[in-house]
């Protein structure tokens, strides 16, 4: 979890499902105490600590009983018994996934031992890049920091481009209905989507000037460094199909003779980049905003 609005909501669902039996039994009490598990188990333990001894011990016993029939949880602090459900920002995608991969796909268990781990990420598209690097490492082994290539990034982020989950355009829908994106100047509805109560609904936007600038930066970086540049864009995602059209258009504004510039879907781009990294070759990644966040942690941590 790293996205201020959307991820804590998903995180709260995970906590409630993992501790389902305890919530079924003590849900009313938790509501009375004002527990909000979107803030993690730390919030729950804090509130439970205020209960009379007998009641507190019963609740804690029921919470701990949930661990008996469940998979072990990756630990943030084995000595203190702090699991990754303690707080939504203890284990975050951009920092924790690379560390886990660098550790051979392992994280710490309750006894302070490294064990194989299953990572569960709250989205589907960019999770695949991590699957790709995990598969690659299973086949090729760990990267060697002495010989591996580097992957500088040019991110699409000007003018709040593709802001994600941490801004004022992400909502938890309160009732069933329709979400519209409306042009305030004309009243025209640009996009409509059916939504249900509890949905997380996000709008993202990119301004034309930001795309133009992004293409220029990528071309300049390629020319100055001599590295190939890969635009990580998937023609099957409607938003990115629009970006691809604009990228191709704005590439014509530059002298790209002799430059190696390609557009690939995220998984292909990751595979292509890793094939070069392992041979000590450098590759520029030109990506949207979320991948800028992920990749600028992933490759430096590996290196």
Annotate the PLM regions:
Residues 1-13, 21-246, 250-303:
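Extended, well-ordered protein cores
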